[in-house]
Amino acid sequence: MTHSPLAQFDIKKLIDIKMFGFDVSFTNSSIYMLLASILALTYFYLAFYNRKLVPSRLQVSAEIVYNLVADMLNQNIGVKGRKFIPLVFSLFIFILFCNLLGMTPYSFTATSHIIVTFTLAILVFLTVTIVGFVKHGLRFLTLFLPHGTPLWLAPLMIVIELFTYLARPVSLSLRLAANMMAGHVLLKVIAGFTVSLMIYLKFLPIPLMVILIGFEIFVAILQAYIFTILSCMYLNDAINLH
């Protein structure tokens, strides 16, 4: 199974740790999430530790990323969304760096595992729920009954809206994990055929691999953006009840 396209997603224990009967071992997934966090912190430290009136290219790139997240919150929530910039920005950067780090050879893509993406999605879900109840109290429950719903249809609508609400973390996490896994499997399969194809098609497979890698990098960035924009939309539901 060492050459299986799915072998790249195997979880491997590096340090076996047991706490209170639970397995909390340090794995290859853990080390790549830690590495992604360190790289992100290093990137923004180098970009902002010596800010100048005429910014460097590194500072400009960091400011573009920050403004992208700030604009997402502003467009979806408005001024009230500014207080959530640290949370949403951290989510976007963590997912982005995990996705991009997984593109390097012989690395591991933490966001291809549902347990990682589901944990991030649950964080968003709990934040939205807590914010909704803190801001609106029991009136937050009106989210599950659209305005103007006929009384006879209310029970059915409440069930549908509640199910939709509870399904948010599942859909949010599955979308990210499935896209990252599918892209890496495709690259692995095509890379396996590249050497054989070069015998018959000369150098044609090489540009194809470059195009696919470029597309996968685009998908990695896009999936981080989609996860973040959906999180902003869910926060908007909690802050501005409709």
Swiss-Prot record:
One of its GO terms (cellular component) is plasma membrane. InterPro entries: ATP_synth_F0_asu (IPR000568), ATP_synth_F0_asu_AS (IPR023011), ATP_synth_F0_asu_bact/mt (IPR045083), F0_ATP_A_sf (IPR035908). It is found in: Cell inner membrane. PROSITE patterns: ATPASE_A (PS00449). It is a multi-pass membrane protein. Disulfide bonds: none annotated. One of its GO terms (molecular function) is proton-transporting ATP synthase activity, rotational mechanism. Gene3D superfamilies: ATP synthase, F0 complex, subunit A. Belongs to the ATPase A chain family. F-type ATPases have 2 components, CF(1) - the catalytic core - and CF(0) - the membrane proton channel. CF(1) has five subunits: alpha(3), beta(3), gamma(1), delta(1), epsilon(1). CF(0) has three main subunits: a(1), b(2) and c(9-12). The alpha and beta chains form an alternating ring which encloses part of the gamma chain. CF(1) is attached to CF(0) by a central stalk formed by the gamma and epsilon chains, while a peripheral stalk is formed by the delta and b chains. This is ATP synthase subunit a. The gene is atpB.
